[in-house]
Amino acid sequence: MPELPEVETSRRGIEPHLVGATILHAHIRNGRLRWPVSDKIYRLSDTPVLSVQRRAKYLLLELPDGWIIIHLGMSGSLRILSEALPAEKHDHVDLVMSNGKILRYTDPRRFGAWLWTKELEGHNVLAHLGPEPLSDEFNGEYLQQKCAKKKTAIKPWLMDNKLVVGVGNIYASESLFAAGIHPDRLASSLSTEECDLLARVIKAVLLRSIEQGGTTLKDFLQSDGKPGYFAQELQVYGRKGEPCRVCGTPIVATKHAQRATFYCRHCQK
């Protein structure tokens, strides 16, 4: 599933081609996504795009009378086309722009979403979200406060959007490795120093992935059709049985709530 770096990479890639241009019309080939494509999106016509923002794993297209909320789901990606290339099987939505560009949404598993809302505040998919991990609000002090009485493993807690948004399976595993923290540790067992370190490395890992265009394991592509290159720098995720790049110990894979977790039993305590 695309996580924060992939969604932010998509935002940065599409923003220059959408802001200041006008949506001439939307072409919906298959509106049966995780939730049906909102009726308002079908009827878009001569609508300028004012901004392209991100909240958690949601892309937000600001229009004069409301917002398009896009979620990439498990396998979605957005591309900017310079011409109307023939659509393939999993190309479900096109926004045809006044500058000759086309924003094309591809989603093999159709777990994504294209929603419309008049107001962002209070929308059900955006309500109850925790802070952005790259914000000043997310720091060691905040993390320690939230972990202090939490009797659950730190790995799934990091993936809870009520704690912090956008840190999914890949970046939770990678951040815990970078901090030297075992994913099975109780959140409440983390010291002040460990919380400070973990908050810092989460930011560093996410920023590095954004620099590299995110992580492509299967479906995700950047808006120019290129893969995300952070996959080449993964330390533990997807490397079961391979030697740890630090100590040489084989990487272990376990499952937490049906999600694979990767770690080094020597480097992470």
Swiss-Prot record:
Its EC number is 3.2.2.23, 4.2.99.18. One of its GO terms (biological process) is base-excision repair. The keyword Lyase applies. Binds 1 zinc ion per subunit. Pfam families: Fapy_DNA_glyco, H2TH, zf-FPG_IleRS. Coiled coil: none annotated. PROSITE patterns: FPG_CAT, ZF_FPG_1, ZF_FPG_2. CDD domains: EcFpg-like_N. SUPFAM superfamilies: Glucocorticoid receptor-like (DNA-binding domain), N-terminal domain of MutM-like DNA repair proteins, S13-like H2TH domain. InterPro entries: DNA_glyclase/AP_lyase_DNA-bd, DNA_glyclase_Znf_dom_DNA_BS, Formamido-pyr_DNA_Glyclase, FPG_cat, MutM-like_N-ter, Ribosomal_uS13-like_H2TH, Znf_DNA_glyclase/AP_lyase, Znf_FPG/IleRS. It catalyses: Hydrolysis of DNA containing ring-opened 7-methylguanine residues, releasing 2,6-diamino-4-hydroxy-5-(N-methyl)formamidopyrimidine; 2'-deoxyribonucleotide-(2'-deoxyribose 5'-phosphate)-2'-deoxyribonucleotide-DNA = a 3'-end 2'-deoxyribonucleotide-(2,3-dehydro-2,3-deoxyribose 5'-phosphate)-DNA + a 5'-end 5'-phospho-2'-deoxyribonucleoside-DNA + H(+). The keyword Zinc-finger applies. A zinc finger (FPG-type) spans 235-269. DNA binds at H90, R109, K150. Keywords: DNA damage, DNA repair, DNA-binding, Glycosidase, Hydrolase, Lyase, Metal-binding, Multifunctional enzyme, Zinc, Zinc-finger. It comes from the Bacteria. The active site is at P2, E3, K57, R259. Its cofactor is Zn(2+). One of its GO terms (molecular function) is class I DNA-(apurinic or apyrimidinic site) endonuclease activity. Monomer. Belongs to the FPG family. Involved in base excision repair of DNA damaged by oxidation or by mutagenic agents. Acts as a DNA glycosylase that recognizes and removes damaged bases. Has a preference for oxidized purines, such as 7,8-dihydro-8-oxoguanine (8-oxoG). Has AP (apurinic/apyrimidinic) lyase activity and introduces nicks in the DNA strand. Cleaves the DNA backbone by beta-delta elimination to generate a single-strand break at the site of the removed base with both 3'- and 5'-phosphates. This is Formamidopyrimidine-DNA glycosylase. The lineage of its organism: Bacteria, Pseudomonadati, Pseudomonadota, Gammaproteobacteria, Enterobacterales.
